[in-house]
């Protein structure tokens, strides 16, 4: 047979049936495709790629790597685990992501990209390659549950005016920096992250695991409507606005449109769906207190996501907005700093997850001149302190996220250190490891990675960090990446300065 690869899941074939799901592959001209995404299909795709003109591929790769090496896009993996040889981390203290204590008298055995055992010292296999951690602490790779891959490293004006190709290249560069900050997984909650996810997973670009939501689904004049007033009204024959065409947002009004936009993101490979259910601090058109999407519209998104085994998360701050989300079946509240205590109790009673960002009145706060935005920012900062208190008081499931936009990605680790102002350092780390990993399991079968994340336990994916710093005493070491002595993702070392 003759094959020519176009992209993941799409290839030409003389006659087609997916040999994994055993379903006929529909024909559009010469293009046959299957979306089963099974390991067998992906393995076949890798073999197909290997059969493509190796000389052309190697020549092209050399040119591309040479062109972008200085830009940060060349893979920065230090060394993969040698085939079939286990790796044993020794002489360490362990924070496993769930237990709020450090453990001594344990080693970490890694095989096939996973943690295969936690043997006592001296009990690991003799053939294992040993890495002496020098008495340092080993923690799970960090997880940011509220990240925007495409928007984290560029200014707002660049995001809204530059060619989307430039934004993707900048996102690739930022992905490498994100991994070097110790964040081995991010939940992307809005933006065209599918291409970067594929590049990272295939080893083209170094970066974290990405759980993509795809385009933010927003009502007209909602928090994800990035049009200008001079583009209104839009007529049916008008081309899509820039943000929609680029995959930043998808506008939907009414149940049928919400269903369609949700299903489009699922078709692209979304692991969860993101909607906007309220306004923002500095939004130009949607007030902070505004309610967005009716309950019926929200439920349409929830139904479509549930039919695919996944869930909806929602940008929302106010009690009224959060309550509407919960009634509609939304599983994860993003922000929520203006919730009253009754609403927090409602979240706890319904098992709703809460992704809380440390929006505080400090050096990382956005600088506003508009009095309304300044006042709204003050309310959110005060609400952030209550959110941490009430979330723990009422035993809400919650996890750490940053929501860094338009530059400032270097503050990602520093943002996590702020949680130690409100709880013990290990409790704060738990929210960016074990708890965050549990939130990611809501994606069910749409999760792009098979295995537990955020924990150091038998069978978990081998994403971990070796740190210089006392994790029981504080988290200030997170602000300096030099304190991350080893960064491992899937058993592969992307940094080793031990």
Regions found by a protein language model. Give the residues of each.
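N-terminal secretory signal peptides
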Residues: 1-53, 67, 71
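Active-site core of metal-dependent hydrolases
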Residues: 18-21, 34, 220, 275-386, ...
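N-terminal twin-arginine translocation
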Residues: 51-56, 65-85
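Histidine-rich, glycine-flanked metal-binding segment
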Residues: 73, 77-79, 85-87, 94, ...
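C-terminal cap of metal-dependent C-N hydrolases
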Residues: 92, 445-447, 452-498
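Metal-associated gating/positioning segment near the N- to mid-region
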Residues: 136-202, 220-229, 296, 328
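Divalent metal-dependent hydrolysis catalytic cores, especially in the metallo-beta-lactamase
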Residues: 170-196, 207-216, 270-283, 311, ...
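His/Asp/Glu-enriched, well-ordered alpha-helical/loop segment
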Residues: 307, 380-470
